[in-house]
Amino acid sequence: MFHNMSKIPSYWNKAKKYLSKKDKTMSSLIKKYNSPSETVLTSRKDVFYSLCKSIIGQQISVAAANAVFLKFKKKCKNKINAKTVIKLSTIQLKSCGLSRQKVKGIKNLAQQVLSKEFKPRIITKMSDEDAIIYLSQLRQIGRWSAEMILLFTYNRPNIWPIQDIGLLRAISKNYNKKYLPPESYVSYLNK
């Protein structure tokens, strides 16, 4: 499994140049938010950790997700891996603030990793769409979560999460739309 290697994606500088040439709005945003904000792109190369964090953060505020995740991390004694999680009881996991469904999702993930039913290493050999489908077969992981894992854990360069509310709001704000843009407009920007 991937572990704690953090780095800015290798394609990042090339991508910034490409986007700057292609789109005036993107060019000004890239200039505006250039370093040190790029450190936001560094990622934790631990798929199990990232999937647990994704499950925990679903449908709650960022602040609540961070609080629950800190309790979860403490319960795991800072060792968030399948072997540690599988040993925790449902009651222990719920005491972190996890719902019954999230507990099931995290326990199921741990079981699938330990049984090798889920093999994170093969994702590196898959196309983006195949990887999204593969990740989406996990309990509590839908398309958006799979896209976020590919983008921030695997640092895939061509992920364009058209259902992401943050992306939609940013497009609306920066392209002077008075509404959240339709999927067709978001897809057009990706070309």
Kindly give the residue locations of the regions a language model identified.
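Short helix-loop boundary/capping segments at the starts of domains
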Residues: 25, 35, 57, 61-65, ...
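Alpha-helix initiation and N-capping motif
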Residues: 12, 23-26, 65, 164, ...
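Intrinsically disordered, low-complexity, charged terminal extensions of DNA damage-control enzymes
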Residues: 1-43
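A short secondary-structure junction motif
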Residues: 53-65, 93-102
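Catalytic cores of DNA base-excision repair glycosylases
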Residues: 73-191
